[in-house]
UniProtKB/Swiss-Prot annotation:
<feature type="binding site">
    <location>
        <position position="258"/>
    </location>
    <ligand>
        <name>NAD(+)</name>
    </ligand>
</feature>
<feature type="binding site">
    <location>
        <position position="176"/>
    </location>
    <ligand>
        <name>NAD(+)</name>
    </ligand>
</feature>
<dbReference type="GO" id="GO:0033711">
    <property type="term" value="F:4-phosphoerythronate dehydrogenase activity"/>
</dbReference>
<feature type="binding site">
    <location>
        <position position="147"/>
    </location>
    <ligand>
        <name>NAD(+)</name>
    </ligand>
</feature>
<dbReference type="InterPro" id="IPR036291">
    <property type="entry name" value="NAD(P)-bd_dom_sf"/>
</dbReference>
<feature type="binding site">
    <location>
        <position position="233"/>
    </location>
    <ligand>
        <name>NAD(+)</name>
    </ligand>
</feature>
<keyword id="KW-0560">Oxidoreductase</keyword>
<feature type="active site">
    <location>
        <position position="238"/>
    </location>
</feature>
<keyword id="KW-0963">Cytoplasm</keyword>
<comment type="pathway">
    <text>Cofactor biosynthesis; pyridoxine 5'-phosphate biosynthesis; pyridoxine 5'-phosphate from D-erythrose 4-phosphate: step 2/5.</text>
</comment>
<dbReference type="GO" id="GO:0008615">
    <property type="term" value="P:pyridoxine biosynthetic process"/>
</dbReference>
<comment type="similarity">
    <text>Belongs to the D-isomer specific 2-hydroxyacid dehydrogenase family. PdxB subfamily.</text>
</comment>
<dbReference type="GO" id="GO:0051287">
    <property type="term" value="F:NAD binding"/>
</dbReference>
<dbReference type="InterPro" id="IPR029753">
    <property type="entry name" value="D-isomer_DH_CS"/>
</dbReference>
<dbReference type="InterPro" id="IPR038251">
    <property type="entry name" value="PdxB_dimer_sf"/>
</dbReference>
<feature type="binding site">
    <location>
        <position position="259"/>
    </location>
    <ligand>
        <name>substrate</name>
    </ligand>
</feature>
<keyword id="KW-0664">Pyridoxine biosynthesis</keyword>
Length: 376
């Protein structure tokens, strides 16, 4: 049995090698010839699974993507061909939410505001958007939710229309899939018309899919230099990046918002476990058993934490400025976008820090954010 895996999928080689012959290749450059005699294909979001890719896949029975998003896979085609497909929903939700919080903490420090005084507008209330809302609840930060599809499906949460969210939010953070059809397409959801209405004190963050934001229109909006700010982790035509847009962004990163080591381990183990079920085998993997000890010091709190403490804790785990600096330095090099993703450092989640506190400290909000808590 041959199993073709994306070479950038951590822990995949060691897990899948127990099931068959593992072949590791670059996910972005896969061709139809690579799938000849392959039984299973394990990918990430850079691989487009379409008719061209699988035209010679004479033995393919299983495709798994170790990502939450699925827009890179022609699911109808796979179903038609009798090829089982699965994804890893929610695997990256913690990393993306922590990315957003890091961006806002740094911007707050740079521009002299408090995120606790801001209203967040979360566009897309799936796994990532819902987890971010959970984090904001823990910190008692107000937010609005927009997700017309979930609202139509009867989701009991309180939703608002997109126009209302854009008008009333200080921070607009996007967490939708990319869709071009249907009643609520998200392609260029944030386009020229929408961008022209945004206030100069608003912040836009796209850590979803690049084409959700019209990058050309965003560039024109930022050229006004009136205080409006934008953060992009994803780009409309990635791995190509508009080099005129880049200097206008507050932060820019190469599609790594959800690239925490825990999230990648969850994604890999989820599709490994799905594949074992598909094969009717008993093997199962636990991501926690794969993770190394985090090189992050534990923290002791002897008094009640405040906003400054929270800022320091968040930046101790992940400071977006590190990735932003590397991105700006390297992106002009040919192939840099994918290389930065391939060589991405072992970023950890809040759970990698253990916070020890005395009884005088209410650590519940920090625990709800994901930090590991020990009370003495």
């Amino acid at each position: 049995m041959k199993i073709l895996i994306d070479e950038n999928m951590p822990y995949a080689a060691e897990l899948f090698s127990g099931l068959g012959e593992v072949i590791a290749k670059s996910g972005r450059t896969l061709t139809a010839d690579d799938l000849i005699d392959v039984d299973a294909l394990m990918i990430r979001s850079v691989t487009k699974v379409n008719a061209e890719l699988i035209e010679k896949a004479n033995k393919l029975k299983f495709v798994g993507t170790a990502t939450a998003g699925m827009d890179h896979v022609d699911q109808a085609l796979l179903k038609e061909k009798g090829i089982f497909f699965t994804a890893a929903p929610g695997c990256n939700k913690v990393g993306v939410a922590e990315y957003v919080l890091s961006c806002l903490m740094v911007l707050a420090q740079q521009h002299g505001f408090s995120i606790f005084d801001k209203t967040f507008g979360i566009v897309g209330a799936g796994q990532v958007g819902s987890y971010l809302a959970q984090c904001l609840d823990a910190l008692n930060i107000s937010y609005l939710l927009n997700d017309p599809i979930k609202e139509q499906e009867g989701d009991s949460r309180s939703f608002v229309a997109l126009d209302e969210l854009l008008e009333k939010s200080d921070v607009i953070t996007l967490h939708t899939p990319i869709t071009r059809d249907g009643e609520y397409p998200t392609h260029h959801l944030i386009g020229q018309k929408t961008l022209s209405k945004l206030r100069n004190d608003q912040i836009l963050i796209n850590a979803a899919r690049g084409p959700v934001v019209d990058n050309q229109a965003l560039k024109q909006r930022l050229l006004k230099q009136d205080g409006f700010k934008a953060v992009l982790d994803v780009f409309e035509f990635e791995p190509d990046v508009d080099m005129e847009l880049l200097p206008l962004l507050s932060f820019a990163t190469p599609h790594i918002a959800g690239y925490g080591l825990e999230g990648k381990a969850r994604g890999t183990t989820m599709i490994f476990n799905f594949y074992c079920e598909f094969l009717k085998r008993n093997e199962r993997a636990d991501p926690q058993t794969l993770l190394p000890i985090a090189p992050i010091p534990n923290v002791t709190l002897n008094q009640q934490w405040d906003h400054s403490t929270l800022h320091n804790l968040i930046q101790l785990v992940y400071d977006v400025r590190k990735d932003d600096a590397v991105f700006r330095k390297e992106i002009a090099t040919v192939g840099a976008f994918d290389k930065m993703r391939k060589d991405y450092w072992d970023r950890r989640e809040y759970s990698a820090i253990t916070i020890t506190g005395t009884q005088c400290c209410d650590l519940t909000p920090l625990q709800q954010l994901g930090f590991t808590i020990e009370e003495v």
